[in-house]
Amino acid sequence: MEGRVQIPFMKETPPLLKYLLGADSGQKGSKFRKNIRAYNSMFAFTSMGGRVDASINQSKGPFVFRMSGQNYHHIGSLLPEVGKKPQFAQLYIYDTENETDNRINTLLKHGTKTEIDHEILHELSKMLDQHNNLVKSFRMARDRYKTQPESTFCLRLLNSRTRDGRRYNMPTFSEVTGLIVGDFSEANFQRDVIIEHRTKGLRRITDLHPSFMPMTYPLIYPYGEDGYRPDISLRDVTDSPFKRQKLTMRQYYCFRLQQRLMRDTLYFKLVDYSNNI
């Protein structure tokens, strides 16, 4: 990358995640690592869309996930439709008194309910409540819904950032989201994602939005850090033969996944765990 990529390192992994991913976490950590994708999906704000071909698994052999066409992610409204159960982002706002059970129930159709540890799920929820700015924003919407259930409001996920992406990947609380009360026009918000109060449809969220990755993989971005942003400039290097001035998505993830001495980050723990499966 010729030294042209400059983005901040990820923050130190929260103690709970570091413990669960470590070799000294015993049976508890083993349960978590075995079902880490299920735990992440229970806290994800978005759902994956696309044409999944299930016929490939009708014969004997290892499981294969095959998708035709484009892969994309959706996000629904803040509150579920009347008579329906909450899912994904709605779990942070609606019926939070039964939040743990509601999250486990989302996995019923996948047959993994009995493998989920209630204690681990509760501890992860507390960890995200404490550290994750996106979760805090949705909890703010929950509090407004509880105190003013009759009011109509939306949550705005801001696309733009005011600070240099080469130095900061932790946006301030005001840079992440904002509550919109009453009527609004989406034309005023350009590429921001507007999560409406209660609607029937789903809204696609682009993978170029800074909050796309932390909303899809909250256990990899436990602080709600920004993911890739197309507006991050490359570092100026004297006599560089390259004309491109902005960071590409490929360069971003190459930098993130590069092993570095004395850097014990969540990315590397997940890579080490994957190599030992």
Per-region residue spans from a language model:
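Non-catalytic interaction regions
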Residues: 1-277
